[in-house]
């Protein structure tokens, strides 16, 4: 958060303060423990994939770096809270009426497969590596397993929003 040259990283500080605030809203131990586990495992898979294929590296050159893994469960909980806030506000914005489910089906089947295609294009130079094949199969499998497009597209939107700030940092 504080650079040794004396400067403070305001984007990182603000992002972590936002995530800390999200952690205090609607706490449910049972639900949160599941999300913490999913975040840790999912983050571990993502970091394993990215560092083993050398799509990205960290200054420590660890593959994956253990110090980054605790950020994933925290971000997962924050995304869950943000998604629930967004979900509640959607119906309010629609004048108190429930947003039609077809809108979410359309949004899901346009946005999420487009994201998967973009990720495959991003990793195109590593498609011959087993890690990329595993992650591609996971992305396609999760995409096809959608049972609640409203929940999933709201989670996708919240995760994308928070991810922009985390990645920009």
Residue spans of the language-model regions?
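Aromatic-rich, lipid-facing transmembrane alpha helices and their immediate juxtamembrane interface loops
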Residues: 1-169
């Amino acid at each position: 958060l504080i650079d040794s040259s004396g400067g403070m990283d305001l984007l990182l500080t603000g992002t972590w303060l936002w995530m800390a605030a999200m952690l205090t809203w609607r706490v449910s131990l049972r639900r949160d423990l599941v999300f913490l586990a999913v975040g840790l495992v999912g983050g571990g898979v993502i970091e394993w994939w990215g560092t083993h294929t050398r799509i990205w590296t960290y200054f420590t050159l660890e593959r994956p770096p253990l110090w980054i893994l605790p950020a994933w469960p925290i971000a997962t909980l924050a995304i869950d809270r943000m998604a629930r806030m967004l979900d509640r506000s959607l119906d309010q914005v629609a004048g108190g009426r429930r947003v039609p489910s077809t809108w979410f089906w359309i949004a899901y089947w346009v946005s999420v497969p487009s994201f998967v295609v973009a990720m495959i294009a991003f990793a195109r130079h590593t498609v011959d590596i087993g890690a990329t094949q595993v992650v591609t199969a996971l992305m396609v499998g999760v995409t096809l397993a959608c049972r609640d497009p409203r929940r999933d597209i709201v989670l996708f939107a919240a995760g994308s929003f928070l991810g922009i700030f985390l990645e920009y940092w």
